[in-house]
Amino acid sequence: MRDSDERFKGKALIVDIMGTWCHNCLDESPVLQRLQEQFGKDGLEVVGLSFEISDDPAQARKNLQLYKNRFGLTYTLLFCGSIDDENVKKQIHSQLNNFFAYPTAIFIDKSHQVQTIHSGFKGPGTGDEFQAQIREFEELARKLVQ
């Protein structure tokens, strides 16, 4: 994924560092899908950067397709290699200092300036905290597309 990619020109982005094995990612992905549906027409694009347990591209792509089907995801999921620390450092650490949690959502405005980085995700079991986090994500997405 590059800033120069024509698909993302003039669009606000939520870039999600995730994995199909990550329990909090399982809770976050449907929320991101709803944001894509709600704000996509206004120029929001959600992109998942997936780090998988298996570094076998065929197996990882199969897992990603199953994941997309399970949650009805229409946004882009890109396989970025294994969760091996060296691979993760190579892929993202030079662009994102202090990455430490799956999922990490990066909220980027239409001029491609990072507005917020959100690490972790509070799932439905947290009750009011989950609902507050959904409202926070919705407000962030709304601001990105203005």
Locations of regions flagged by a protein language model:
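A short beta-strand-turn-helix
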Residues: 1-13, 36-39
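Solvent-exposed loop/turn segments at secondary-structure junctions
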Residues: 19-24, 51-56, 82-85, 114, ...
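Hydrophobic beta-strand anchors of alpha/beta hydrolase catalytic cores
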Residues: 14-15, 46, 105
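Structural microenvironment flanking redox-active thiols in thiol-disulfide oxidoreductases
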Residues: 27-72, 84-93
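Structural micro-motif
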Residues: 72-76, 94-106
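Short amphipathic alpha-helix with an adjacent loop that forms part of the alpha/beta core around
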Residues: 3-8, 88-96
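Thiol-/selenol-based redox modules, centered on thioredoxin-like
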Residues: 101-146
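Short pre-active-site segment immediately N-terminal to redox-active cysteine/selenocysteine motifs
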Residues: 11-13, 18-21, 28, 53, ...
